[in-house]
């Protein structure tokens, strides 16, 4: 039997769903082994006196019996079970918890809203890339957490009494998706937010990250509809109009919205619109992890790395035995090219980061086979867990690696939605050229080059006589010029 001492479990008894995460510690990082989620909708079982109904408690216990089976193999000191908003509120929470502990065979801790917010922030800090100074938003079933912080350190923590289940029962009880129900839900949410808005704004943020089912649902809708993954107020308003158009909750149909998420989607959407409006949020992306990841990393006592993406790339390079020196060499050439065309092409810093990440992983396909290495690389990157990269960024990396050599598949570059299609094409061109000029695998054999962009025309200037002295190099560059010309990317080499 394999060792179980490296296994850890985190269980979150939420107001809408119960979740279990089982992971294995591998070289200072975590590998997910099991994720189980059950819609228990505990908050829906609270009556006006805040007593949980027997039916709701039974749904919860039934779910925990499933979880208990998986926990038998894990040391009790490596299991954490926490309960959140509904069990903070319920007057008979003690009855539920006593039986829950009996079923699971380990303690269940009811955590405060502030502790929940802190753990959510830790989960985000360990798993989400981007700028250091962030605002984290988590809309749960009965509470919403809002946290600001820098790096691993929180600067303000709030847990507010509103959630997608309680707002559903309160403002969409008639299952009618009319404008007036949305207005009432948003107005109430803004009223709850108002007392904390000033302090959140005072601490400020460079990026806003969402870590809940509502945000996950939005991400799935946007991916299904081919939009980019950034959540904006404009997109939220469009989705609200779509919901209003559907008329009733049971008739709610939006491309990419699963049946499972549909019930609490309008109420979560109303809360999110209120948050965007009240805090003047420009855009939000999906977090890589939240409460359960915060619990796991807390048990492991792992420090938050400054750059999650770098840690991920290092781990993948080690695991697939990628030649790190060569990856760095290609990255250096690509960065040099990027810096020379950045202003002409109006490229953003995130595009540079993603290009460098593609360089770091470009030879991963060789770990499968030289034949079809780009296809293997794309498959691996698309399917690996890459903390710090969003789903759309993973798709872009996979697409760049698929097109690192050979004829270009333009449609694949247009099907990703992390960056505009034109930017994906530009990054692809730079990656392909960087790989060619670093192919001798020695720093002293990379020529001094200048690259100029004039609209779509790239002009590459090499040292005098270089093409004559390097007949194989010339042949490869001629072939590359031809491949780029097939997709209307003009490339001149002197």
Curated annotation (Swiss-Prot):
Q: Does the keyword Endoplasmic reticulum apply?
A: no
Q: Keywords on this record? A: Hydrolase
- Please name the InterPro entries in this protein's record: ATPase_NBD, GppA/Ppx_hydrolase, Guo-5TP_3DP_PyrP, Ppx_GppA_C, Ppx_GppA_N, PyroPPase_GppA_Ppx
Question: What pathway does the UniProt record associate with this protein?
Answer: Purine metabolism; ppGpp biosynthesis; ppGpp from GTP: step 2/2
Q: Which domain of life is it from?
A: Bacteria
Q: What is its EC number?
A: 3.6.1.40
UniProt-listed HAMAP family: GppA
Name this polypeptide is given: Guanosine-5'-triphosphate,3'-diphosphate pyrophosphatase
Q: Which organism is it from?
A: Escherichia coli O7:K1 (strain IAI39 / ExPEC)
Q: Species lineage, top-down?
A: Bacteria, Pseudomonadati, Pseudomonadota, Gammaproteobacteria, Enterobacterales
Gene for this chain:
gppA
